[in-house]
Amino acid sequence: MKLEQRIFFLICLVINSFSNCSLLVAPDGYYNIYRENKIENILNLKPNGNKSQDSYYPDVCSKAVKNKEGVKSFILSSFPLSTKEYANVIVTKGSHMTLGDGEYHQIFNINRFLNIVCVEGSLVFSTKDVVYMSALVILPGGNFECIDCTIKFRDLYPTNSLIDPFGFLPGIITLGGSLSLLGKQKTVYSAVLIDENILEVQDISSLDIFNGYSLFIFSESFPLGKASTFTFNSNQIKVLEIKIPKTDKSIRVFFYSRFSTFSTSTTASIHITGNSNVHIENFYIDSFGRTTNDQYSDTELIFSQDDPNLITGFINGSNQRFRSSLYIEHSNNVTIKNSVILENRGETRSPLIFFGSNVNISGNIISSKSGSSLIAQYGTENIQSTNNYYSLSLPLLKSLNSTLDSMDYGNEGNGIFSISPKINSINDIFNGQIIAINHIILSDRSSITGFDKDCYSPCYNDSIRVSSKVQHSVEFKITGSTFISSSNYSESSFLFRISETGSKQSSFYKIINSNLSYPISVLLENNAFILDNVYGFGNFTINGLIKRLDIINSTLDPSVTSSISLSNFSKAISIQNSFMDYRSFQKQNNQIYGSIITPYLYYFENTMNLIKVSKMYPNVNHQILAGTVLNMGIEIIIIAPLFGKMDCIFEDESGIQTIPFNKSSNSCVLPYLFKNEGSFNVRVTLSLTKSLDNIIFQVYFPMVTVFNIYSFYSGWAMIDSNIEKEIIIDGNIFKKGCQQQVLGNCTISTNSKLITGLPSVTESDKLNRLFSSGITSINPYEPVTITIPIDKESKKNQIQLFFTHQPIDIETSLLSIYVENQPIFLLEPLQSNLDSTFKNLTFHYENSKSLEKIKITFITRGDIYLTSTAIYSSTNQPIYNEVIGINEQLNILAIVLPITISLFAAASILAGYLVIKKYKKPNMYYNRNTNGNIGMKVFSTKFKRRPKKVIPLSIPLSTNRITKKSLQSLDSMAENPVILLSIPELEKANEPEFNPEKTFLQESELLDLPTPKVEPEEPRINIVPLPRFPTVYKKEDNDKLLKELNITGPITSENIESFFEVDVGLPSLIIKNESEIILQEIDYIETGEIQEMEGSFLEDKSTDTTVIVTKSDGLPKFFQTKVFSKRFNDISKFDNDFFDLKEYIVEHQEESFEIPFMTSEDEVDETKINIIDFLLSPKSNKVALNMYLKSFQNRNHKLCYGKYGSNKNSILVIEGTSYYYDCTDVRLPISTPRSNLNFGITDGNKCIVDRKYRERLQYINVYSEPFRIYTLFPDSNDNVTITTSECCKEIDPFGSLDVDIFVTLKTTTKFNEKVTIRYETDDKELAFSTFVYLNLESQVSSKIDFDEIVLEKYLSEGSFGVVYSAIWRSSSVAVKLFKHHYSKDEIDKETSILSKIKHPNIVSFIGSLNFLNTYGIVIDYHPRGSLNYYTRNQNIKLSMVQNIRISLDISRACSFLHKNGIIHRDLKPDNVLIVSFDPDSSICAKISDFGTCREINGKHELNSKAGTTRYMSPEILEGLPYTYSTDVYSFAILFFELLSGRVPFREIPKREIPRFVRLGTRPRLDQDVFADNDISLILLACWNPNPRGRPTFDTLIDLLEKLLKKYKERAKRNKKNQNQ
């Protein structure tokens, strides 16, 4: 084969396995072109239309000269070259060539003619001499490394007459190999301006600055960088040629050398595709990029009409897209770190473009004169940008005459332009842009990209019930990033702009955990926008138009509050637990009923430094009967002492009531009597006097709607009128007969569909019948309208709408409701976590026009079904309808009380002296959550009054209108009156102020209303009889046994037990000894009814019985001899490795290995010899980690080699058969249509952890005699549970058999396993075997597969267990394995706390694991280790600035914990991890070890001692409960140790420390460092013996920030004095 043919063959067949790759013959003078349909194959998408998906590359390597075989050096003599002036060379596959420093004189000759370098093998440049070339092409499998090397690109030699029509060259093309550009030293640094030509730069002592370096400065005044010479003294640099304006605050410097550089003297580009590996670090890419900021104009091909592979001409484009400094597509293994990309040759589109690649870049300078600093094209779903400096000099901005189809974006002057990813920007600097982050939503991209199902983020399969393209909600995180907008632009600039393209699909878009000081623009006319945990200050404001705005857990400064006119751009607003300025806040008038306006309004800017509102009740919209008392109140946190008396002034439309503030409970509660019907807006004002002149806070309560008793007027059930009967509940008739017609009492719009057989969502059969059918839209997001009669005589009506949510996926589904075209609820979120749930929406309707019928419209994506409606009239007597008979008795439909979903907690009807005691808190429904439901199922609760608890008689009550019948449950015939509730299970994540276990209402004011949870129905148990067998068999009875059990071959120790375990028709066998076999007497097995699961065969609703396939708990004793263990475990190399280890231990007992094992060589208990026993004793078992690593590949053959696993006993099933690899082989007697089973998960989707999936395996007997089928499934284990309906079955001649397989993946894992199948006739003359392959991969979850963990290094050991560093899915992590004495509850507590808290100064929780009954957690790994190492190591001395900064980070972490109701309880240097010693870095320290942490609630006091005695507070040593002040004391001891370098209480015996601390002893402040009053006062305050006298961590943060600033300034002065 010719070389060019071989190269083309590789390109077409190796690069990404392209199926449609062909060589196109170009006209003379041009390179031939190869064409590939890469996108369809890589993205697993199918074309949807006539759009071309082809990409073209020049065939530049086909005539390259290959190297001589076996040569190592990339020099002239390594290639059979003539004395040409230019040459194209190729490093062939298998060759490893280098270019080093000592080969310069030979390189010089090559430089004169080196043109194109192709790499198919390996090529490493480590020379410090400049290498000139025109093009570098890395072919599939090729590897190119440039280590501290410099390459300069120039035009292709003119003597080479061939032209690249697509403009790739000069430059680099990487087509599926590996590209590494590495500099040995960091050259990018942050700088602080000391004077106009003096810069302070930290941590540059290791950089040999005078060794050929020049200085580039990037700042507000120099967006494209400014070069200068400099002088250097310590960490200060004096700039000689330029002066830096004092207004420049964000400065980066780059020390440029001629090493580690790619530069070009012409227009060039770097193009990376084909799933290439890219690592660019400490490198400089200079002057690349040729795509301008004008409209794209791509080169087009003209093909011959006779030959589709013949190009007859070109239409040359003037501006080929994606020829940038760095273009990366379909390559997810990309690292770009601490590098500089400078694109200043002209006005370009963008220096950095990603296409179908997830992005993680950090510490870079990206500078250009372009339309955007970074562009993320479709397929790039996530951007993680950290500490990057995006610097832009605005080009001449032009409007593009382009459409969406052209995908011509990003020319507007952006920092990051994105059309699809989720963006996380941390500590980035955007300098000179008009828009820092510009995000355009293309919710359905199919019409643009030409791909089927190309919707935003991964598309899910269409539901059985709903055909819909599904979107994820979208999250943006902007934390600590700075935006310096262009001063040369007159129009508005935005930190963030998000807009949609007119899609009718509604979704959530969120900015979370961000500090925003710049304007944002939001154009989401059909969507909801959420600010979650956002601090808005400075110039922050919101412009645009949205349908719904939610402000959650956020704080807005006064200037921000005044600039946000809420009612101008949002139709519905929800403000929860958020602080806004009173004088600037404008309450929305005529709010939509579903909105919640509950801001905490502060009066002065420093208010929140003194006092904060912690909670309020009610905290959701409330509905209540007239004449009922409702306890309304707030609770606050006092941060600093307040002088004078404080009052709580409650007021509404009817008047004002004032009560004194209760200092003991830090609350004020008012029993509020609502006498009249209507809607009431109550607010409470906290004032230092009874006057409103000294207001501190003002809080609006949610709307309280008061109504009189209503009569049931009409009810309608969405049921099939031809089959179902009308439904009567408590005498109230729910009529059938709603039809798609114009006339009639109840009509439905024609764009709806009726779905029957909805799953049960309540405990009541009656109610389930009412909710068993429902209507929804045929097409997603189309409004469905139902017209129903209403009492025209009643002005006030109450309407109940009952919905069943049958979710498509785990994403939030949105519901909007309109009555007579007026919005009632807008984009209310429903999330059911794949379980069907019941939702009730109840609201008032004012029939002011005396209508006889009303139109109710609802809009969903198609997975929410309206099942029934009920209308209540306020007239004295119900109005009868000529079609429907109405019960005359007063009846409130007690299905549920009025509740608004998702944002509304349940409110019970308060009858007589009933006052609610407990309330649930609203859920952060925006957060994705796999456990909690937004709404619980309906249940009934009997009304029980707490004994001896009464309401004061001074509160008037009204009970005369409530009857026993009106409160009776619809699904209970109990004599006692009951109230039926529907309480949404609303856990409010990230909101510590709402704690359901801690209420501030007084016990004397409460009545108990128990609310039992609904548990899923237990499966029915079927008893299946089995044949009886004799109890004992002797060896001589083996043949008889074999005959009875239809087993071939002798019963041996290798096969007997495991074989029977998987056979449903056989009892379990245990071999007692070598002469007896005992058969357990089992008369039945349990098989549970399995509910219908999602999969390929969901339409089959038959009930299946299953048998759980489980792994054996242990081998019988006969199997436990050393000889057998070796032989038995030959099947399992993993176990074999550890038996080898066991032998090693026996032979080396003098090393005292501390692992449990039997000393007798004749009997070994396998259950006690496993990997955990070794890994949990690493100090005494030196070989443990090595043996673990040795066994890793054997345990993970699927991960390491891509192979399938199988049951270790498969060899026993296959033995003695005719084996066929493919189960669809026509030579087999049993036909199996499919060899690969994917459980209905296709198109690259992944299954959900802990969800059961079903697949059906079908057998068809094509022979005229019966066969018996034995099926051996993989063992269930910690990662997967596999069950099946059949393991052993006979199939009749020409008959068929269906076997259902159920698989549940319990962790984040890949399940690629073989099912072993054996077919045999009764006489055993014909026996065949084959495999069926199971394929399933789970989505990423918090449960981790231990088999994917690669332990690398032992780190530490404690009483809890052992910590290792490890690799998990290419990420460095730390794995904490708990010792066996730790209970699962203790571990679950730590895991629960870690999973809830997300903060930069708290170690990040990645997941938990369970392996061989040993639990562990996985967290992020920080190689610098714990603070304890540095405080106890006398050879290491941290500076004061470093010590204070570390203490500040600890305080920030503890403040966050306390705000979330968590006490750490074990704060000490061991539990502080060091991230960086640079005080100016974003993170210096993180706290860890949450095994002793506890969440505080109102019922349980934390009395149990936890932590380390040396750091325990005196009140804990005295046995008093833990409080937040406990951590403050521990911090003081830690802070002392950090500053002094001494172990606290080192002079006191450890056992005596508690006694001395209780007596008031504290560490001595006798060192110079404590002469600073600012430091000593902090310590004295923090270890105050009175916990109430200790400051909060918020106060400490302020003090430490001031202290840090002081010592930084002192350090600068000292350095300046030293330099002088």
Swiss-Prot record:
The active site is at residue 1466. One of its GO terms (cellular component) is membrane. The keyword Membrane applies. The chain crosses the membrane at residues 892-912. It is found in: Membrane. It holds the Pfam family PK_Tyr_Ser-Thr. Residues 1-19 form the signal peptide. It is a single-pass type I membrane protein. The keyword Hydrolase does not apply. Residues 20-891 are extracellular. Keywords: ATP-binding, Kinase, Membrane, Nucleotide-binding, Serine/threonine-protein kinase, Signal, Transferase, Transmembrane, Transmembrane helix. Residues 913-1620 are cytoplasmic. Its EC number is 2.7.11.1. It comes from the Eukaryota. One of its GO terms (molecular function) is protein serine/threonine kinase activity. ATP binds at residues 1355-1363, 1376. GO terms for biological process: regulation of developmental process. It catalyses: L-seryl-[protein] + ATP = O-phospho-L-seryl-[protein] + ADP + H(+); L-threonyl-[protein] + ATP = O-phospho-L-threonyl-[protein] + ADP + H(+). Its main location: membrane. Residues 1349-1604 form the Protein kinase domain. In the N-terminal section; belongs to the GDT family. This is Probable serine/threonine-protein kinase gdt4. It comes from Dictyostelium discoideum. The gene is gdt4.
